[in-house]
């Protein structure tokens, strides 16, 4: 009998979330795909470092039972195991989109979950909507 997906325990490259949280960053980096591994091996820039400090502070506040809102423009930050459980608001160029971090997001970039473009929904063409509508008979 196959176990339903909801019952399966999350694993990232064979490691449980608890193992990932205890693991040093250098060991975790080796589990990532090449693009993310290269990005993290080059180190964190100032904006990413500030975001990590906010995440660590928010984790401490969560343990006390408080809810902390983190807002960031840093879309190129790789999601780390320490971020799981937090809600980070990521800027998409117009507004901050709340992103609830779940274990399945580990190894992806924050920007992947805050889309910058929306599907354009055009209205009905009417009089003076386009140049060619000048020749449409008025109702």
Curated annotation (Swiss-Prot):
GO terms, molecular function: rRNA binding; structural constituent of ribosome
Family: Belongs to the universal ribosomal protein uS19 family.
A GO-annotated cellular component: cytosolic small ribosomal subunit
Keywords: Ribonucleoprotein, Ribosomal protein, RNA-binding, rRNA-binding
Name this protein carries in UniProt: Small ribosomal subunit protein uS19
Organism listed in the record: Ignicoccus hospitalis (strain KIN4/I / DSM 18386 / JCM 14125)
Any one of the GO BP annotations: ribosomal small subunit assembly
The protein's role, per its UniProt record: Protein S19 forms a complex with S13 that binds strongly to the 16S ribosomal RNA.
SUPFAM superfamilies cross-referenced by the UniProt entry: Ribosomal protein S19 (SSF54570)
